[in-house]
């Protein structure tokens, strides 16, 4: 009998990607986040689709339509809460997935890594335009502040900002186009995720040791399908706990007030997952400098593969690099905290020091640690 799984053109692709895929036998739970991100993306698209059925992208009715979804639509409150908190889970998984990639040297699969960075930027853009849609105070002022950064670009800045706005300020045209962007971008994310997977399957997965795993591989199914199913169950449990018991804990109270262009909130800040970048932006007193630092904080990820100096791929057996990695993690948590604080001392200086340390760690200290560890591994040491 011909095995359809291995011969059918479409089934064959699925089989080679999720069933008979040769996978290293020693990959840990840190390798679960790819599939969890896929699950998050599917949940977000489905919940978003149901929300879009009831949402109106008009400045006069957007806020009311979100209230209507939560009050009058069957299980609308649940769909809304899952979508809002699903974004937080998405970014949590994203940061852990990237952290894993840096720790275990997965960035040396350059194509996969670069597509991953483009994916991160696309997801960040999706989340930003999505945050504007409820048209609350923080939605409006967040959109105003962030889109205003475009005006810092020399010569074309103001024209570019007004082109994005569709007028002379954030208004009806901006909301309508942001809704259009928020609808289309997740499908671009799906396409990029498929390309990400395609490049990954060209090389095969990395593993915690960083050693070539070709001599010891096992089929993806049933071993890792079961493992992924467990991860997804735990993710769903965490999401439901957050959405049902504490749905507004990660949001901003200002967003419960309708957008008012005449009243600026005392502290304008984005959602928690953008706070680290926002802190870097604010740490430079110059507008253009801040914008460049903001861009550099994300785009620096693209040059991480070029800064790899160690003879070993993974940090598993490199204690100095490990220490620096965890300092970087603590530094990012510090930046996240600072991003949510008012612009006053001592927060200003802490933010500036943390921003400096962020770039110093990635550009200087970690490459130097790799060279030092190479030297320490020499027999004469």
Curated annotation (Swiss-Prot):
Residues reported in the UniProt entry to bind a ubiquinone: 201
Cofactor: heme b
Keyword Transport: yes
Keywords assigned: Electron transport, Heme, Iron, Membrane, Metal-binding, Mitochondrion, Mitochondrion inner membrane, Respiratory chain, Transmembrane, Transmembrane helix, Transport, Ubiquinone
Segments crossing the lipid bilayer: 33-53, 77-98, 113-133, 178-198, 226-246, 288-308, 320-340, 347-367
Annotated residues for binding of heme b b566: 97, 196
Gene Ontology biological process terms from the UniProt entry: mitochondrial electron transport, ubiquinol to cytochrome c
GO molecular function per UniProt: metal ion binding; ubiquinol-cytochrome-c reductase activity
Record Pfam families: Cytochrom_B_C, Cytochrome_B
Alphabetized InterPro entries for the sequence: Cyt_b/b6_C, Cyt_b/b6_C_sf, Cyt_b/b6_N, Cytb/b6-like_sf, Cytochrome_b, Cytochrome_b_C_euk/bac, Cytochrome_b_N_euk/bac, Di-haem_cyt_TM
GO CC, any one term: mitochondrial inner membrane
Binding residue positions for heme b b562: 83, 182
Membrane topology: Multi-pass membrane protein
Record localization: Mitochondrion inner membrane
UniProt miscellaneous comment: Heme 1 (or BL or b562) is low-potential and absorbs at about 562 nm, and heme 2 (or BH or b566) is high-potential and absorbs at about 566 nm.
Entry function: Component of the ubiquinol-cytochrome c reductase complex (complex III or cytochrome b-c1 complex) that is part of the mitochondrial respiratory chain. The b-c1 complex mediates electron transfer from ubiquinol to cytochrome c. Contributes to the generation of a proton gradient across the mitochondrial membrane that is then used for ATP synthesis.
Family the UniProt entry places it in: Belongs to the cytochrome b family.
Name this polypeptide is given: Cytochrome b
Organism: Murexia habbema (Habbema dasyure)
Gene name of this polypeptide: MT-CYB
């Amino acid at each position: 009998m011909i095995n359809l799984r291995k011969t059918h053109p479409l089934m064959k692709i699925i089989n080679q990607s999720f069933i008979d895929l040769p996978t290293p036998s020693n990959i840990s739970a840190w390798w679960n986040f790819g599939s969890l991100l896929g699950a998050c993306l599917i949940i977000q698209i489905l919940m978003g689709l149901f929300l879009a059925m009831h949402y109106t992208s008009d400045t006069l009715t957007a806020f009311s339509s979100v209230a209507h979804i939560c009050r009058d639509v069957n299980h609308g409150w649940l769909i809304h809460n899952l979508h809002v908190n699903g974004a937080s889970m998405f970014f949590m998984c994203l940061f852990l997935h990237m952290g894993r990639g840096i720790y275990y040297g997965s960035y040396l699969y350059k194509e996969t890594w670069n597509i991953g960075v483009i994916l991160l930027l696309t997801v960040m853009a999706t989340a930003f335009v999505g945050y504007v849609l409820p048209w609350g105070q923080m939605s409006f002022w967040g959109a105003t502040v962030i889109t205003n950064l475009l005006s810092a670009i020399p010569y074309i800045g103001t024209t570019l900002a007004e082109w994005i706005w569709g007028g002379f300020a954030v208004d009806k045209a901006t909301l309508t186009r942001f809704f259009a962007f928020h609808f289309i971008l997740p499908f671009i994310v799906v396409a990029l995720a498929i390309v990400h997977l395609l490049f990954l399957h060209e090389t095969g997965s990395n593993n915690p040791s960083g050693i070539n795993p070709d001599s010891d591989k096992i089929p993806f199914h049933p071993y890792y399908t079961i493992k992924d199913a467990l991860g997804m169950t735990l993710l769903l449990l965490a999401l439901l706990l957050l959405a049902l018991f504490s749905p507004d804990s990660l949001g901003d109270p200002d967003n419960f007030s309708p957008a008012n262009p005449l009243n600026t909130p005392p502290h304008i800040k984005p959602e928690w997952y953008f706070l680290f970048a926002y802190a870097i932006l604010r740490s430079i007193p110059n507008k253009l400098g801040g914008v460049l630092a903001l861009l550099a904080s994300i785009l620096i990820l693209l040059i991480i593969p070029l800064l790899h100096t160690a003879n070993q791929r993974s940090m598993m057996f490199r204690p100095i690099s490990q220490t620096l990695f965890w300092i970087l993690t603590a530094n990012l948590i510090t930046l996240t905290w600072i991003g949510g604080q008012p612009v006053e001392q001592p927060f200003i200086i802490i933010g500036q020091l943390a921003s400096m340390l962020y770039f110093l760690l990635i550009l200087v200290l970690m490459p130097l640690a790799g060279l030092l560890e190479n030297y320490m591994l020499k027999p004469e040491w």
